[in-house]
Amino acid sequence: MSNNVTEKKWWQSAVVYQIYPKSFQDSNGDGVGDLRGIMERLEYLGKLGIDAIWLSPVCKSPQADNGYDISDYQDIDPMFGSVEDMEALIKEAKKYNIRIIMDLVLNHTSNKHRWFEEAKKSKDNPYHDYYVWRDGEEGVEPNDMKAVFGGSAWEWVPEIKQYYFHQFLPEQPDLNWENPQVRKEIYDMILWWMEKGVGGFRLDVIDQIAKEPDKKITINGPRLHEYFREMSKETFQKGDLITVGEAWGADPERAKLYSNPDGSEFSMVFQFEHIGLDQQEGKDKWDLAPLPFLKLKQIMNRWQTELYNCGWNSLFWDNHDLPRIVSRWGNDKEYRIESAKMLAILLHGMQGTPYIFEGEELGMTNVRYNIEDYRDVEIQNVYKERIAAGYDKEDVMNSIYAKGRDNARTPMQWDDTENAGFTTGTPWIKVNDNYKTINAKSQVDDPDSIFNCYRKLVSFRKEYPVLVDGSFKLLLAEDENIFAYERKNADETLLVVCNFYGNTVKMPLTEETEDMGLLISNYKETEDSSVLRPYEARMYYKK
């Protein structure tokens, strides 16, 4: 037996809840969520039963890219509170057995970070080599590399007649990981947060730190895993942490390195292969296409089977960059409750650590705003670009409704009072109009709510070892409507069967489930077990 099964880690049966702090709970009436606001809602999260909170970035930042441009790693942005508030949150969360996971951006800093302000003063400055510089002349860039957010990846600094490299915004200069001093500063900072009781880290675009711009290498550079192993040894392995690397360029082979059970790199990896399925081949996320259902099954099957016993999956539908899953692959009108529960049951039966994004457990939906009500710079940019390029306005807006990041960033819907109980002030972004019917207050005590479906699924991970260590077998691979799979260990069998669509279909696994008990389903009563109703999901179990 491999060591990740025999020596179970706490995070293998854990569920993580992601908070986008700006939109979760405002405690001081300024319209922006903050750390004290999160503390006010710990009881709710305790009720849900989650084990850890992942906070989107809260370090000090000029907010050129929603906090992913850090100007001080050892301070909290005043918008969210102070280091003292962070310490109080860690302490308070501990009472509910909840750990705090910080979002760390180690590929780049803000251009307002003191390291960069020093670095650009002169080539002899001790901080100069903290970043990636190339000689050149104005207008003649070192090469034609492009930044992720558009435009060149090189920015000219006339004072020192050099270009610096930035894979993202010009306000986000890339750190030079080849410099051991940079690595030491980063490790010292991680240890500083660990001493304050932080329970883990999510590492943003971590597969880009070993870039070699002269060879046009951005992801998966030659020294990538060397850096990971050094960082893990110097920091993470000194505590009992959960660590997750965000890797847009990962395939299962590489993910096995990231999440090697020997703990030499990270606990797990975020991969996004299933997330790009509903866009046109070779185009970007705004070019919509229907979800190829069989391909979704194939991809999830591959990650489940290939990482079994030699790596670890992260399971997620939603995050701060993605549209709401019930609107995306469910049905947010007539079957909102059924389809939200189906998507939850489908994901939470798999092997890995599930992540719930704030409001997902309530079945919060996408929004349809006028263009001026959106706050995301990406939405504003794509609107301007596409209208200027002659796209039909209705098509552009439909793409924004479907894929805009602000779908995930509207305020958490706590109750049916003004601003959904999020703030007493004016919210930084409009609240979704449906908050009067979709909110936490109406669901927490309703046994049939989406919230209580999630609560049960969270508790199952502690109750049924098969969810943590069972093998995975995809069933009915060619079925166009049903997603079904079996999990098995020496003592238990679990079978999940989900009707992914809004039509009634025949239930093909009646014999297989005959001697099994029903653990959870998303319809109150099973009138006729030989059919699956729209979006019906069932989880069967036997010991």
Briefly describe each language-model feature range.
Residues 2-543:
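Active-site and adjacent substrate-binding regions of carbohydrate-active enzymes
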